[in-house]
Amino acid sequence: MSVKEGAQRKWAALKEKLGPQDSDPTEANLESADPELCIRLLQMPSVVNYSGLRKRLEGSDGGWMVQFLEQSGLDLLLEALARLSGRGVARISDALLQLTCVSCVRAVMNSRQGIEYILSNQGYVRQLSQALDTSNVMVKKQVFELLAALCIYSPEGHVLTLDALDHYKTVCSQQYRFSIVMNELSGSDNVPYVVTLLSVINAVILGPEDLRARTQLRNEFIGLQLLDVLARLRDLEDADLLIQLEAFEEAKAEDEEELLRVSGGVDMSSHQEVFASLFHKVSCSPVSAQLLSVLQGLLHLEPTLRSSQLLWEALESLVNRAVLLASDAQECTLEEVVERLLSVKGRPRPSPLVKAHKSVQANLDQSQRGSSPQNTTTPKPSVEGQQPAAAAACEPVDHAQSESILKVSQPRALEQQASTPPPPPPPPLLPGSSAEPPPPPPPPPLPSVGAKALPTAPPPPPLPGLGAMAPPAPPLPPPLPGSCEFLPPPPPPLPGLGCPPPPPPLLPGMGWGPPPPPPPLLPCTCSPPVAGGMEEVIVAQVDHGLGSAWVPSHRRVNPPTLRMKKLNWQKLPSNVAREHNSMWASLSSPDAEAVEPDFSSIERLFSFPAAKPKEPTMVAPRARKEPKEITFLDAKKSLNLNIFLKQFKCSNEEVAAMIRAGDTTKFDVEVLKQLLKLLPEKHEIENLRAFTEERAKLASADHFYLLLLAIPCYQLRIECMLLCEGAAAVLDMVRPKAQLVLAACESLLTSRQLPIFCQLILRIGNFLNYGSHTGDADGFKISTLLKLTETKSQQNRVTLLHHVLEEAEKSHPDLLQLPRDLEQPSQAAGINLEIIRSEASSNLKKLLETERKVSASVAEVQEQYTERLQASISAFRALDELFEAIEQKQRELADYLCEDAQQLSLEDTFSTMKAFRDLFLRALKENKDRKEQAAKAERRKQQLAEEEARRPRGEDGKPVRKGPGKQEEVCVIDALLADIRKGFQLRKTARGRGDTDGGSKAASMDPPRATEPVATSNPAGDPVGSTRCPASEPGLDATTASESRGWDLVDAVTPGPQPTLEQLEEGGPRPLERRSSWYVDASDVLTTEDPQCPQPLEGAWPVTLGDAQALKPLKFSSNQPPAAGSSRQDAKDPTSLLGVLQAEADSTSEGLEDAVHSRGARPPAAGPGGDEDEDEEDTAPESALDTSLDKSFSEDAVTDSSGSGTLPRARGRASKGTGKRRKKRPSRSQEEVPPDSDDNKTKKLCVIQ
């Protein structure tokens, strides 16, 4: 079997194993498909369909892309991406499907029409962000790249990206909008993915032009522990990661420097410095009290709660508004200032009448929630409709006064009614009327407690229910509780309005309709009328809030005389049962039929039976059992003693023998302390000694006590055992600490490197402080060593200590051994000398006292413990001498360091030395790391310089860009990401140059030369081109920029200055407005002219790349570009232009990485012997700027357009010896010719390096 037949069999077996896949005949030719067909295929998601669509999107022109977008192609892609992200990636096919889907979205955004269409709709970016809710790291990497590109594309893109992150936070229930970024950054070890996340952070921070906005965004990330994560990432060895880290640090340093200059020397990134500056400003003014109150209030906000986060954001917004209002010089009251702070833009300010109405309504709503539901308020529209009539009928009342009366009237009424007996009640009031309480003194007019009638009465008399004053009615007897049920039934009232005027008079409290039972009428203090007649509602609430003893008839029952069994029911809430439409509310009406149950039978049947008294019975007394054990101890103590004895696992006699012999092998300090607590008390001793029966009857604990009492001086023996054991433990703990403190003092006094280092710091400090009151110093306090890191240099992450160590490494290498001299003081840090000395002194006193007791005890005890006590006393006296030596060294150290001997704390001194030693070692490590990073950056810079040197150059010495000649549009996303991977170099160039430099460069631009028109469209009028190598559109027909401000896709598509007046007069389109700092020229890496065609064409417009700067077209010596005739045949064949590059773009296992790599490799030159040149150029290394999509995939997967399967393939290309006919591709210097009228589907490539 030949090798070829074996390969064919393997191929067939693999296809059979993979199984049949859904394929469509049109998928193989999607390059010529119209948008409608592509959208139809989108409804059948598959890797083959998405791959074919991606190639079609990359090769489409502007018109085709617009049709695709207008037919909701992007909507289908985003919906499919969200659906695929939601169902997980259980299989590799799901992951590939997600990856190819997001690559289609990227292909859409690569075109100017696509990205502008996305930015025109907020929902698209939100949908894109929802694709982050997946476990597929490659998909998340692609989405994050798209969001980063949107951030730097335009201010609108930056705003929409932040909005999308806010939306994702809400949808996924996260606490902060940047939590998704920081969580992925903290939990990922995939270096390319980490680089992408850092690029997102940089793009978000560097997006806004406003310094304060950038600082705020950066502080949000820092608040999520970004600096700690960056410190960990610096240890990773990756060049692309280093670029992003440097971009973050450099931008942070620049912003801090600018902020320091703007804020007058205050470090606005330091909470302490900002607060110190604020406190210094207000400390001598009455405003300090308000500042203290604000701080006290903020102290109660817990930052971990989600509601607190919203409150902090609201407070920040209020402070920003307060800063804006502070510049307003107009004088206004406190209420007006608060109103202006809380006012919403675009909402008209309410008039005083409306504010009064709203305040009443707010109080009403609050009182309703806290009171009984009997009070049914009038609907808001009715109240608002009655305002004009109320204003005409009522006397004007001051708004502020009415509000204050409203706030205090109800509590005051309750207090008065609760504390004083009720006076004679007023007469019953007619609906809508009002009366005055009986004098003296005359209070404000009492509004009606009845219902408000509809405003249908004739205009002359005051309308009922509107608070009009009525003459007092003749007095009537007070109503009795429950008398309302004998009234004739009124007609059904309107909801919440009570009865209209025609019904008969109602007693007070009945105006709200039949359901609520009326309370007894008691006088109350009421407020004067308020706008809208709402005071009636408030008065009714006050009356009702007093409660009522009246009970409806259907609820009245007689109390039972016996204890009844309970009915297990579920009570309805009162506010539900008393609704006027409910069945229970209808039972309270006077005309309801009363049903009286037979309570006597119920009481007889459902009461608990009476307990019968127990009859005394003669029970024979039980014979008293003799107790098995006799104990004189209480149960708790006996239990504790038994537990204590069981731990020895021996008999009581053995335990007593060990105590008698002073054996401490089984007695440690804690056991002896517990035994002392369990010793028998005086009464227990007397009882045990009086016991004369058999000891076998005693309990175990009592038996142990008898054995213990038989030992002479048993308590003193136990105390001696405890003291000897405790003294040994104290010596083992205290003596090493005291010796270490003494050695640390000696180490500081004898260190050779410390004085030399301090001398170096002294000279540097005098140089820095020269001419100030802190200059010309003879020395400094030792705590100054900790402040060396507070003096920061202009270089990023370099402090004075870093610089001193760099100088010491060069000139005084011995000083780097200083941490060795400070090792013992660092170890002694944290030892409190006072505590250990007091503990040693107390033990010595106990030993001396115990020795005195032993000397007066029996001879056996003296023989056992005198020698042991003497040894412990000698050891503690030696320890006391050690403390005396430490005191002497402390005085010497105080003199050595020029400190006060009485105030010098050895603990603080050693802690200072430990902190300084840690700073010293950390600075050494950071200096070493910075040197290594600088060396890596230098090697990378040399690599880029070598790559730049290998690029061909034109007559003016500038690099010449090779590739398809008609570069009418650029791949926006790829170009932006190329600049991001370079560390935002173009943005740095713009900021470093400034507006003045930019203006001078713009003024020095060469004037546009005479140009010739170039055919850019087919006869049918359809634009031809591609989004990867886009077709011509109005205003997009040129390929190069001016000589001084040229652009190259290596750097990015970037906006530049506005076109000159001459360019505008020639009819070129005006670029869109965009921030001046984004994407301006990088002329050192940009090609501007074709060396063979130094003159531009006639009549061509300058190119506007999105909102980029105007570019000049190439000039050809004839109407056709060079070598156009030789390449026309190749241009007609799309495959001849794609070649191996198109095959690489089809890879799906690494997603878009291959596409980026294929765009990064330029087409080789075709000519005589072109095969050798082609191989030589194809084997060139890939650009170091490209990051892989996912390095966990070791092989690429190729999916052909016919759906035959997904196969692994190697990266290498077929060698020349395979016999395959290699397709000829145009050289990079060749320019493509406009295709014939019958072929407008020509594939073009957008070459991105």
Curated annotation (Swiss-Prot):
GO terms for cellular component: actin filament; perinuclear region of cytoplasm. The keyword Kinase does not apply. It comes from the Eukaryota. Residues 554-946 form the FH2 domain. Changing residue 77 to R: In CMTDIE; uncertain significance. Residues 1-29, 347-489, 928-966, 988-1076, 1112-1249 are annotated as: Disordered. The modification Phosphothreonine is found at residues 1179, 1199, 1206. Severs actin filaments and accelerates their polymerization and depolymerization. This is Inverted formin-2. It comes from Homo sapiens. The gene is INF2.
